[in-house]
Swiss-Prot record, chain A:
Cited Pfam families: PRONE
Domain remarks in the Swiss-Prot or TrEMBL record: The PRONE (plant-specific Rop nucleotide exchanger) domain is responsible for the GEF activity.
Family annotation (InterPro entries): PRONE_dom, RopGEF
GO terms for MF: guanyl-nucleotide exchange factor activity
GO cellular component, one term: apical plasma membrane
Protein name, entry field: Rop guanine nucleotide exchange factor 10
Compositionally biased region (Basic and acidic residues): 17-27
Keywords, alphabetical: Guanine-nucleotide releasing factor
Its job: Guanine-nucleotide exchange factor (GEF) that acts as an activator of Rop (Rho of plants) GTPases by promoting the exchange of GDP for GTP.
PRONE domain location: 35-401
Region (Disordered): 1-45, 400-423
Transmembrane portions of the chain: none
From Swiss-Prot, chain B:
Matches recorded under PANTHER family: ROP GUANINE NUCLEOTIDE EXCHANGE FACTOR 1, ROP GUANINE NUCLEOTIDE EXCHANGE FACTOR 4
Region (Disordered): 1-25, 55-87
Record-given protein name: Rop guanine nucleotide exchange factor 4
Further comment found in the protein's record: Plants overexpressing ROPGEF1 or ROPGEF4 are relatively insensitive to ABA-induced stomatal closure and become severely wilted during drought stress. A similar phenotype is observed in plants expressing a constitutively active ARAC10/ROP11.
Localization per Swiss-Prot or TrEMBL: Cytoplasm; Cell membrane
Length: 493, 463
């Protein structure tokens, strides 16, 4: 029995080897072109052996087989590698060359696993007699074929952005203790206590510099959007683990709590009005809300599937099928809004559970790689935002000192600036994010209903521009700053 | 009298089959299309003295070489090595190792969806498959080709390097009041892996020693065999081709000069045979030890019948029960086992009974390892009167005797089950490595015995 089994594996493996050709070697994937000494080469070999050996053991040093699956081991390895490479990146400056080289090399090793994840597809081959014959050839799995090059590209863009800050003179950093000594007081938020303080010239940034920084920020924002979209898509593709389902209460009402359940199940439902009444004062509360909503969505989905499967009469249920579907759409709408408003929120229980129980190696790599790029992009955006904020502070001081300007004129100009910022950023982000999110929706019907909700929300937004902006901005800054900690499933730490 | 006795003993050995890992290469061997060089054979100079025939040895493995190996070969062929060549070779090595590791992580599942086998089984299968790739077409007493040897060393180093990171944490005292913990290589790996490496090297050296042989090989079915036979009658040729037994139809036929081998060659062959035999015993011991240390899988336990008697059958059960003293050798003689297949069937039954009786005594808790089981049997002298204890002890001695009598027995059902369900990576490496070395050593012994057999046949015929 064992012999036969081995034979099968052997022949299958051999055939796969023969057919597969690595087609997706990218520049970052190749060996370093510069010649290096024998010493370094041997060191590469030893480091790679250690990395892979520990992956194979699933991080279980005893070798007893109680370690994690390959999928989870790879996911953790990518997360830890990113943390060790970027954890110390607190300034807008290029990475150290050695650090960058290590990142490319070790990610190259980890990503090389996907070169061997393939599927068989039919292909036509010209025989010797001129006749076509259909044979099976190997091709890289579709989701990897699409997303890995994209993630590699996003990776390059982020590193290039940091490289762009080489030799810049417009701003600089001083350690926090020096800053405290100068001012005898801290105007910075407490959340950033460990960051060095960014300084700009006493007359502020030049208009050119300001424009250039904004340009860099926009570029990184695009990367963040793309990485977030890929991460969300991969997570949605992962199976909901059985142990997560087993831990759920029996109905959505229990999960949401009375207040939320009543609000969502009202005849008329206004998501903006609903969100305005929620207590979103701490990260923990937002995460808890996210967990509850996701749990109720899973419960409702499962009940709908069961109902369709059983062929049970609608009238026999407490809540009809259509209503439950409506509730699910509303819950999803709120979830999307939360994710827009708090992009740095830690992963929900469902997401953590999916990652920990996932066994698909390809998905593990896609999810972890997109997540670490998402974190890096957010971090860079925060750093750029710090510089722009320092500049705005100086500008405000300058305006206050100007004798020739009237008080009302200055305030008026400030208000206009605030309006422009408030009007532009939330709108553009929400619009594109919302549309992007829809693409991963399960059914067309959901999309259709969500579109209606979406247009309704836009109308609401136009009517109340002033109410929204003062509340959104401070919280956004607050939570963006928390991205200093690399995002990863909380249970893992 | 004495020579007759030796003849009987040696004739028995060639009838044994090769080890189980080796059998997987049948299909590869049947595909061989190499033919003996007839022209070269006929043109051989005729003289009364023995002539070294190394030129006639064909390296059947050459066609199986992969393009990758050429890079390594080029480097080894260069007398003056340049830095660029070294860099190129080492880059290639790094790349190959990376590919090997990547595939191990996927657990033989190319879809990457996580349906592959666990790491331990993956490593075990990989070592077994590597052995088949490197040694599968090695059917003669001759050195392994450089490419195959390098492939074997490189890939085995890759697999064994995983064991470098399997450790256990132990406390160590730095003084009266200071104690720290440090990591140490796991004890079974620390002991057995260097031993296996040593056995591996010794086997390579034995094969390397067969470079200027007095004997040579012809392929079975070769036209030269018939011609040779005819030639003898006509008096044109003095070489004799001895027909071998059919049991090893796939092996090439060894040939010796008409007057037999020289005493020196004979001595050399016997010495190498003894070495290979010792290696076989050592590898077998390590393999048995590792298998015994593996837990008995639940899936095996659930398939056992309720009584040990049902497994082993009435005849054997009666023998185990009634005899005042139990002599396993005598029982095996009585049973008149005629084939290895029968021996394996008996081993499976006895082993199943052993586990069943052990469970009944309460000594076998959930998935207890066989070692603990063995210790319980020998340790519980006070409960020697218990029937199940006696039965278990006797079953164990019978199984042991059976394995001694048939050293190349295939794996029992329990062995196979343990290997398939094992999750321990270190044990997977030790078990598979010792098993393939065991198979190779046994093959070397068999091949040497074949040559000695032909030699004796030729000399007896002359007398």
């Amino acid at each position: 029995m064992f012999d036969g089994r081995n034979s099968g594996h052997s022949s299958f493996s051999s055939r796969g080897d023969g057919m597969h050709t690595p087609e997706h070697e990218l520049a970052g994937h190749a060996a370093p072109s510069t010649r290096r000494g024998k010493q370094n080469r041997r060191s590469d070999m030893e480091v790679m052996k250690e990395r892979f050996a520990k992956l194979l053991l699933g991080e279980d040093m005893s070798g007893g087989g109680t370690g994690e699956t390959s999928a989870l081991a790879l996911s953790n390895a990518i997360t830890k590698l990113a943390d060790s490479m970027f954890g110390e990146q607190m300034k807008l400056q290029p990475m150290y060359p050695e650090t960058k080289e290590n990142w490319r090399k070790e990610m190259g090793w980890l990503l090389s696993v996907i070169d061997h994840i393939v599927q068989f597809v039919p292909s036509r081959q010209m025989g010797k007699n001129g006749q076509f014959t259909e044979i099976m050839v190997t091709k890289q799995r579709d989701d990897l074929l699409t997303n890995i090059p994209a993630l590699r590209k996003l990776d390059s863009v982020l590193l290039e952005t940091l490289d762009n800050f080489k030799d810049q003179k417009d701003f600089w950093y001083v350690p926090r203790d020096m800053e405290d000594a100068d001012h005898n007081g801290d105007w910075r938020r407490d959340e950033n206590w460990w960051l060095p303080v960014v300084k700009v010239p006493t007359d502020g940034l030049s208009e050119e510099s300001r424009r250039w920084l904004q340009n860099q920020k926009d570029s990184v924002a695009q990367v963040l959007k793309a990485a977030t979209a890929i991460n969300a898509h991969v997570l949605s593709e992962m199976h909901v683990p059985e142990n997560y389902i087993d831990s759920l209460p029996k109905n959505g009402k229990t999960s949401l709590g009375d207040f939320l359940y009543k609000s969502i199940t009202e005849e008329s439902f206004d998501p903006d009005y609903f969100v305005s009444f929620l207590d979103l004062s701490t990260e923990h509360k937002v995460l808890d809300l996210k967990n509850r909503i996701e749990a109720s969505m899973v419960i409702w989905k499962r009940k709908m599937c069961q109902k369709e499967k059983d062929g049970k009469s609608q009238w026999g249920s407490t809540v009809s099928l259509e209503k439950r579907e409506l509730f699910e759409v509303r819950a999803e709408t709120i979830l999307v809004m939360l994710k827009q408003q708090f992009p740095g929120i830690p992963q929900s229980s469902l997401e953590v559970s999916k990652i920990k129980n996932n066994k698909d190696v390809g998905q593990a790599i896609l999810e972890s790689y997109s997540r670490v790029l998402e974190s890096l992009a957010s971090k860079i955006m925060s750093r750029i935002e710090d510089v722009l904020e320092a500049d705005r502070l100086v500008q405000r001081q300058l305006m206050g000192e100007a004798e020739t300007r009237s008080e009302s004129e200055a305030e008026s100009e400030y208000e206009e600036t605030e309006k422009v910022v408030a009007a532009e950023t939330p709108n553009s982000r929400k619009l594109s994010d919302f549309i992007g999110w829809r693409l991963s929706s399960d059914t067309k019907k959901h999309s259709s209903m969500s579109d209606i909700e979406f247009f309704h929300k836009v109308e609401q937004e136009k009517e109340k521009p002033m109410m929204k902006s003062p509340r959104a901005l401070p919280k956004k800054f607050s939570y963006l700053a928390k991205l200093e900690n690399m995002r990863s499933p909380s249970d893992r730490h | 009298m004495e020579s007759s006795s030796n003849s009987d003993q040696n004739e028995g050995t060639p009838t044994s089959s090769v080890s189980s890992p080796y059998r997987r290469t049948y299909s590869d061997i049947s595909g061989l299309s190499h033919r003996f060089d007839v022209q070269s054979f006929y043109n051989r100079p005729s003289n009364t003295n023995a002539v070294v025939l190394s030129g006639h040895e064909e390296d059947v493995s050459e066609d199986a070489e992969e393009p990758k190996d050429d890079v390594v070969n080029d480097v080894h062929g260069d007398g003056d090595e340049e830095d660029s060549d070294i860099d190129s070779a080492e880059d290639a090595e790094l790349e190959m190792m990376r590919e090997r590791f990547a595939k191990l992580l996927l657990g033989e599942d190319m879809s990457g969806s996580g349906k592959g086998v666990c790491t331990a089984v993956t490593v075990s299968n990989s070592i077994t498959n590597l052995y088949a790739t490197v040694f599968g077409q090695s059917l003669r007493l001759q050195p392994l080709s450089t490419e195959k040897k390098d492939l074997w060393k490189r890939e085995m180093n890759c697999f064994m390097s995983i064991c470098d990171y399997i450790v256990e944490v132990i406390p160590r005292s730095l003084g009266t009041n200071v104690e720290i913990t440090e990591t140490k290589l796991r004890s079974d790996i620390l002991m057995s892996l260097p031993a296996l490496r040593k056995l591996d090297n010794m086997l390579m050296e034995i094969l390397d020693s067969f470079t200027e042989n007095e004997f040579w090989y012809v392929e079975r079915g070769s036209s030269s065999m018939n011609s040779g036979g005819g030639g003898r009658d006509s008096g044109t040729f003095r070489k004799v081709v001895v027909q071998r037994k059919d049991e090893k139809w796939w092996l090439p036929v060894p040939c010796v000069p008409a007057e037999g081998l020289s005493e020196e060659e004979r001595k050399h062959l016997r010495h190498k045979r003894d070495c290979a035999s010792q290696i076989h015993k050592a590898a077998l011991a390590i393999n048995d030890s590792t298998l015994n240390d593996m837990d008995i899988p639940d899936s095996y336990l659930t398939t056992l019948p309720k009584s040990g008697k049902a497994s082993v059958g009435d005849v054997i059960y009666k023998q185990l029960c009634t005899a005042e003293k139990f002599y396993p050798d005598q029982l095996l003689d009585i049973l008149k086992i005629t084939s290895e297949h029968e021996a394996l069937e008996l081993a499976d039954k006895v082993e199943a009974s052993l586990v069943t009786w052990r469970r009944k005594t309460g000594g076998l808790t959930h998935s207890k390892s066989s070692w603990d089981m063995m210790k319980d049997i020998s340790g519980d002298a006070d409960r020697g009167n218990d029937k199940n204890h006696i039965l278990a002890a006797r079953a164990r001695s019978l199984l042991f005797c059976l394995k001694q009598r048939y050293p190349e027995l295939s794996q029992t059902s329990l062995d196979i089950c343990k290997i398939q369900f094992n999750r321990d990576v270190g044990k997977a490496v030790l078990e598979s490595y010792s098993r393939v070395l065991e198979g190779l050593a046994y093959n070397v012994v068999s091949w040497i015995d074949d040559v000695l057999y032909v030699d004796r046949t030729v000399r007896n015929r002359d007398d």
